[in-house]
Amino acid sequence: MKTFLTRIVKGVFGTAYKLLSALLPVQHDKVVIASYREDQLSDNFRGVYEKLKQDPSLRITLLFRKMDKGLIGRAAYLLHLFCSLYHLATCRVLLLDDYYFPLYVVPKRKETVAIQLWHACGAFKKFGYSIVNKPFGPSSDYLKIVPVHSNYDYAIVSAPAAVPHFAEAFQMEEKQILPLGIPRTDYFYHKEHIRTVLDEFHQAYPELKHKKKLLYAPTFRGSGHHQEGDATPLDLLQLKSALHHKDYVVMLHLHPYMRKHAHTEEDDFVLDLTDSYSLYDLMAISDGLITDYSSVIFEYSLLKRPMYFYCPDLEDYLKERDFYYPFESFVPGPISKDVPSLVHDIESDHEADTKRIEAFSQTYITHQDGKSSERVADFISSFLTSGAD
C-alpha cells in the first residue's frame, strides 16, 4: 500500500512540475532554501542567508516545514511539498540541507542548480547510498521508485578528505563535491558573541563558573523522525556518583527527535539545556565533550578541547550503520564502553589526544577562517548573477 501511494504521489508531483516548467520561466534572481528538518533557518543556512540578503536584487524564498505526527500532519506536510513545486520549478538555485522528496521525483530543469549543504559536518557515519539495504538506509526497492539524492548539481563539504565519501553517498562525481567549508563553523570565529554567551551563562548559573562543564551530546539513533531505543545510553546517575564531588557538571543537549525518549532528571549535576542554548553555545561553554557517534566531533575539534567517546554498543552500531573510517583509530579521543572506564578517561590527562585533535581538525575542516558562509554565498551568487548554466 505504501509503495502504491508513493508511486501516486511521485506521478502527481512529476506531472505538476512538468506543467509548471512548461508555463513558467526560471527566475534567474531567485534562490530557494528548503528543509524539512526545521521550521526556521538553521545554523548552517543562517549565515548563507544573511550574506545573500545583502544583495537587494536577489529574491530569496524560504521553504521550512517539519512533518507533524499522525495522518493529518502527514497530509498537511504533503500539501506543503506540493505547493512548493512552484518555487522548485521557477528558482535558479535550490539550496538543501537534507533529504528532499520533491527534487527526487521531478525532471529538474537544466537551468536550476540544486546544491546540497548537508546538515552533518564531515563524513563519519555512513549515509545515503553507502547504507542501501541497511536498517538506517533506503532499500533497493524504494530507490527504484524514489532515487534519493538524485538531481544534485553540487554538494558542499568541509574538506577534501570528505569528497570521496560524499560522492559515494550521493552517487555523484567527485568534481561535483566542493570543499568550500561548512557555514556553521563560522560561529567559532565570532569571539565577541562567544564572550557574551559565556558572560550570560555564568550570570544564569554562577555556581558553575569554576566547575568543569562536560557537554553530553549523543547521536540520534534512528531513521526519519524516529528515535530507536534509549536517547541517553550513558547512565548519568552512575556518572554522578563518580564525579559529583569532584567539581564536574554535565550539560545535556539532545537531537529534537530524541527528546521524547530521554529519561533524565535535572539536578545540580545534570542540566538539560537543549531548549535554553544552541548546541554551538554549549560547545563554547563546555570544557569537554562526551559523545558516541555524533558528527559534532568535527566542529568541536576547532576548540581543541578533550573529547570522550562512550560507546557501549559499538559492535552493534558497526553492523547496523558503520563508518567511513575505522572507528577506533579515527576518533580523536579515548573510547570507553562502561562508566568506570569513562570516568578514568575524564580524570586522566590525555596530552597525546591534544595533538590528535589538532591533526584531526586540520584534516577534516580545511577552512578555519570564519568565512565559509561567505564562500558558499558567493558560489550561489555566481549562478544568480550570471544567469548561465
Curated annotation (Swiss-Prot):
Tell me the InterPro entries matching this sequence: Glycerophosphate_synth, TagF_C, TagF_N, Teichoic_Acid_Biosynth
> Keyword set for this entry?
Cell membrane, Cell wall biogenesis/degradation, Membrane, Teichoic acid biosynthesis, Transferase
One GO BP on record is: teichoic acid biosynthetic process
Catalytic activity of the protein: 4-O-[(2R)-glycerylphospho]-N-acetyl-beta-D-mannosaminyl-(1->4)-N-acetyl-alpha-D-glucosaminyl di-trans,octa-cis-undecaprenyl diphosphate + CDP-L-ribitol = 4-O-[1-D-ribitylphospho-(2R)-1-glycerylphospho]-N-acetyl-beta-D-mannosaminyl-(1->4)-N-acetyl-alpha-D-glucosaminyl di-trans,octa-cis-undecaprenyl diphosphate + CMP + H(+)
Protein's job: Catalyzes the addition of a single ribitol phosphate unit onto the glycerol phosphate of the linkage unit, as a primer for polymerisation by TarL.
Classification via PANTHER family: TEICHOIC ACID GLYCEROL-PHOSPHATE PRIMASE (PTHR37316), TEICHOIC ACID RIBITOL-PHOSPHATE POLYMERASE TARK (PTHR37316:SF2)
In Swiss-Prot or TrEMBL terms, this protein is called Teichoic acid ribitol-phosphate primase
